[in-house]
Curated annotation (Swiss-Prot):
The gene is rpsG. One of its GO terms (biological process) is ribosomal small subunit assembly. One of its GO terms (cellular component) is cytosolic small ribosomal subunit. One of the primary rRNA binding proteins, it binds directly to 16S rRNA where it nucleates assembly of the head domain of the 30S subunit. Is located at the subunit interface close to the decoding center, probably blocks exit of the E-site tRNA. NCBIfam families: rpsG_bact. CDD domains: uS7_Bacteria. Belongs to the universal ribosomal protein uS7 family. Part of the 30S ribosomal subunit. Contacts proteins S9 and S11. InterPro entries: Ribosomal_uS7, Ribosomal_uS7_bac/org-type, Ribosomal_uS7_CS, Ribosomal_uS7_dom, Ribosomal_uS7_dom_sf. This is Small ribosomal subunit protein uS7. GO terms for molecular function: mRNA binding; rRNA binding; structural constituent of ribosome; tRNA binding. Keywords: Ribonucleoprotein, Ribosomal protein, RNA-binding, rRNA-binding, tRNA-binding. It holds the Pfam family Ribosomal_S7.
């Protein structure tokens, strides 16, 4: 932790094509080894595929997908009297979007399609339809929080 006060949050610039900060954050999640150009090409190609396959605006479909992925509750480990409890806590809004984007990219990478554009496009379409790996991850997270509801009074 810094000794001299808090470090200011860095603001992300909206992407040039869709003028959306969420798209920039997704590009940053896709990017490997600082190759932003490659990440942008992958995302914009995936958006083209989404538009072709759904017949709707890609940004609309993407935002719907992210809303379907973002978790409301998660569990955090809390040590009480020598034993660890999984305590359900609400997820902060910023962390919700971060987790949603992270899960979207991770589950897209695990898919079997040939190119990353295909994988990402299909994962976005699946998430918009409330199916796919990322949505399953959110459901599992919510189930875990529901199962550990009894420990909610240990919240801090």
């Amino acid at each position: 932790m810094p000794r001299k006060g808090s470090v200011p949050k860095r603001d992300v610039l909206p992407d040039p094509i869709h003028n959306s900060k969420l798209v920039t954050k997704l590009i940053n999640k896709i990017m490997l080894d600082g190759k932003r150009g490659t990440a942008q090409r992958i995302l914009y190609s995936a958006f083209d595929l989404v538009e072709q396959r759904s017949g709707r605006d890609a940004l609309e479909v993407f935002e719907e997908a992210i809303n379907n992925i973002m978790p409301v509750l998660e569990v955090k480990a809390r040590r009480v009297g020598g034993s660890n409890y999984q305590v359900p806590v609400e997820v902060r809004p910023e962390r919700r979007t971060t987790l949603g984007l992270r899960w979207l990219v991770n589950y897209a990478r695990l898919r079997g399609e040939k190119t990353m554009e295909d994988r990402l496009a299909n994962e976005i379409l699946d998430a918009a339809n409330n199916t796919g790996g990322a949505v399953k991850k959110r459901e599992d997270t919510h189930k875990m929080a529901e199962a550990n509801k009894a420990f909610a009074h240990y919240r801090w």
